[in-house]
């Protein structure tokens, strides 16, 4: 499937309910069989939407870059966000926080464009669920490597790894 017709744009407060729905749908799909089923079933679209409202209401003072992915019909099909690293021991100053896409957006090329827009050519780190083979393959293709950092998802204990992308000049 080609990327034709897919668009990126910054989110607005009016997008928060849809973002909450998409965010939870992506998690339920991507982490099925990886995270506990009861945890995924309990994810709240309303709480996610409220969290998005909170984030976006403070966004003007933040260097964080967040973009929505709109499919050819104009519906929200995902989002991505990056900003200053949150780790005290971060090997880079910039962190890719998230790239979340609904299944129909995967394989279209829009994830590459999204990553280019929110991270650019800078060095960056990210955390990814260790068992999320699809995401790890995407990040590896984009120059990220496992740098040895390990953590656990706070609510589930699911293993996470830190990946880093270095820029050679």
Question: Which sequence ranges carry the predicted segments?
Answer:
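Secondary-structure boundary/capping motif
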Residues: 49, 53, 127, 141-142, ...
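Acetyl-CoA-dependent GNAT
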Residues: 6, 10-14, 21-34, 38-106, ...
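Acidic pyrophosphate-coordinating catalytic loop
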Residues: 46, 87, 127, 152-155
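Terminal substrate-recognition subdomain of acyl/acetyltransferases
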Residues: 2, 160-169
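A conserved catalytic-core signature of glycosyltransferases
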Residues: 35, 96, 128, 134, ...
